[in-house]
Every structure is written in structure tokens, then in C-alpha cells.
């Protein structure tokens, strides 16, 4: 079981306060709609605080996640949240075939996954040393996890995020081999689906923004208020067995 850290001294906006935030742009005309998902001027809701474990968990429980904002930390709650329901993952025949060439492992190379996601050569990189250290500490406490796609004994791709109850808040993913990040996502979903307690239908993968790439895998947008309303039930779901036992094996 994950270890609950010291509570944060910081107070974030409540879920009710966040749900009441207006969308600042005209959804039909002015909201950016590109390969990176739709971004609204109201997505950034706070700046400051710290990245202590208790602060991070308080943020996720209120529907927020951190990204660097200059030298400070920004706290984000997208007006249009990208989410993946476990029964809505789109798996093409080619991806299913490709998955046979990979082995899925959980939490065997967390730091390496984060480092690969933070590679400064990647476009639009945002993971700095502060973020890497903070999530490493969350991992050691049992809250942050990696799902890894291995091939021929080498890490080929993966993803990492934070698991609280029925919520998996995905932070980033990478691949060194074609389709490896998609296979890791498939491994995540299949691992959560295999829950022996029957809670799979009450779990959700949060991907922050619905990029064009992720929409092709079944991700869709929901309004901020809808996401925040779902959080209360999600947080009450038991921890997935996937994070307790790991899930080595083949995806697909």
C-alpha cells in the first residue's frame, strides 16, 4: 500500500471552485485546436507552492497537476480534460501484432522512464530536475508508477503517472522503438482491466490534454466540471492490484 506523506501546508482551490471557473475563450472560434489538444486561458489556475509529496497528492485529489512555469510551478486544470475509459481504448490489428514483440513490466525502471521522458532533445519538453526528483519521491512512497515496454532485454518505451484510487493520472510517455509507447498504454489498460475486485469499470486514465495522437487511441475530451465531479467516486475506488503485484508479461 502507498504511504501517506505529511499533509501539505498549501491550500489549493477546491473542486467546486475549479468547476465554477469560466472558459475564457470562445470554444467555437478562439480555443486552440491542434495536435497538442485544446488549450484554454483558464487552464492555469495557480502558481507557486512546492513539489513535496503531500502537495502533489493534494493537487491531484483536487483535479490539478503541476508543470514548470518559469522558475516557479504552475498548477493546471484544463477546461477540456483528456481522459481514456478502459473500455474505449482503440487497438488496431497492427498494434495488437506489434505488442507480441514486447514484454510489459511495471515499476522496474521508473527513474529511467522519467529520464527518457525528460530528454531535452524532445520537442516541447517540460520535465526538469525538480519534476523528476518530486515524482521519484512519490514513486518511493508507492504513488507514482511506470509501465514499461521491453524488447530484447532493453527498455523500448514506457509511461509514468500517479495512481490514486481509481484514477491514473498519466504524466508523460516515450518510445525508442516504433509503437513502444502505445504498447505501454495497452499494457496499462489491460493491467487495470484485470483487476480481481471487479473495479475496472470504475477506473479512469487522465491524460491531461487530448492530443491528436491520443485521440486516435480512444482518448476523448470532457469538460472540466465533469472531470471534477467524477473525481470523488474515482478517489474512493480501491488501489488497483496492478500496482501491488506488478504485471510482467505480454500486452495484447
Where are these regions (language model features)?
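N-acyltransferase acceptor-side catalytic subdomain
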Residues: 1-252
Amino acid at each position: 500500500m502507498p504511504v501517506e506523506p505529511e499533509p501539505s501546508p498549501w491550500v489549493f482551490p477546491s473542486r467546486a471552485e475549479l468547476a465554477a471557473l469560466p472558459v475564457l475563450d470562445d470554444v467555437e472560434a478562439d480555443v486552440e485546436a491542434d495536435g497538442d489538444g485544446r488549450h484554454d486561458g483558464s487552464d492555469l489556475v495557480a502558481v507557486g507552492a512546492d513539489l513535496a509529496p503531500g502537495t502533489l497528492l493534494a493537487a491531484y485529489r483536487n483535479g490539478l497537476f503541476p508543470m514548470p512555469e518559469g522558475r516557479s510551478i504552475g498548477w493546471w486544470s484544463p477546461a477540456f480534460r483528456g481522459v481514456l475509459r478502459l473500455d474505449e481504448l482503440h487497438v488496431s490489428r497492427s498494434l495488437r501484432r506489434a505488442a507480441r514483440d514486447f514484454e510489459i513490466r511495471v515499476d522496474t525502471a521508473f527513474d529511467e522512464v522519467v529520464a527518457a521522458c525528460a530528454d531535452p532533445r524532445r520537442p516541447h519538453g517540460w520535465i526538469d530536475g525538480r519534476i523528476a526528483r518530486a515524482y521519484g519521491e512519490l514513486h518511493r512512497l508507492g504513488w507514482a508508477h511506470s509501465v514499461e515496454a521491453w524488447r530484447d532485454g532493453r527498455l523500448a518505451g514506457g509511461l509514468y503517472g500517479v495512481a490514486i484510487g481509481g484514477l491514473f493520472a498519466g504524466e508523460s510517455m516515450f518510445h525508442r522503438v516504433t509503437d513502444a509507447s502505445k504498447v505501454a498504454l495497452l499494457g496499462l489498460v489491460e493491467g487495470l482491466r484485470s483487476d480481481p475486485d471487479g473495479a475496472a469499470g470504475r477506473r479512469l486514465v487522465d491524460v491531461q490534454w487530448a492530443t491528436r495522437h491520443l485521440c486516435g487511441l480512444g482518448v476523448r475530451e470532457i469538460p472540466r466540471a465533469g472531470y471534477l465531479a467524477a473525481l470523488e467516486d474515482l478517489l474512493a475506488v480501491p488501489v488497483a492490484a496492478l500496482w501491488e503485484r506488478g504485471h510482467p508479461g505480454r500486452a495484447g
